[in-house]
Amino acid sequence: MRTEELFNAIRKEEQETVEAILTENPTLVMEKDQRGSTPLLLATYYGYNEIARIILKFNPEIDAKDASGNTALMGVCFKGFITIAELLIANNASLNLTNGNDATALIFAATFGREDIVRLLLKNGADKTMKDARGLTALDHAKMQGIKNIAELLS
């Protein structure tokens, strides 16, 4: 019951409720919803910076993957949430994990034109030589999308 309540509070961006539920039962930070998302994955999916900060205080598995194999960092790189990307990296999110298609956070950021996040990932040591399941690097994806500024960064 409290698990569903936690996920609903996250969806509604109810910061105080999220903090109260996790304070009462910190192990809920590791639970997953029907889509395989942890509380951190869900908060980052919606771009809820403060909810993500609250959840991080309860030491979640920062690199937990959803049903598609995506981490919270991959999700924010796809969506362009730079503040949360910075927060996750500051909390030691792994930069070079891959999902079911062998895509990395850098590949997501490059593919979707997130120059600020590409810069952040590179500055923090993301491996730009990693290839996805099709054998393509982040540079290849940027070129295919015609995103010249990112292609130059990755060259």
Tell me what each language-model feature is.
Residues L28-V29, I62, L95, K128:
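Ankyrin-repeat inter-repeat connecting loop/turn
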Residues K128-S155:
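Leucine-rich solenoid repeat scaffolds
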Residues N8-E13, L42-Y48, G75-F81, F108-R114, ...:
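Ankyrin repeat A-helix N-terminal signature
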Residues M1-N25, M30, Q34-S37, Y46:
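Intrinsically disordered, low-complexity regulatory segments in ankyrin-centric signaling systems
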Residues E14-L22, Y48-L56, F81-I89, E115-L122, ...:
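Ankyrin repeat structural motif
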Residues Y45, N49, R53, K57-E61, ...:
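Alpha-helical adaptor scaffolds
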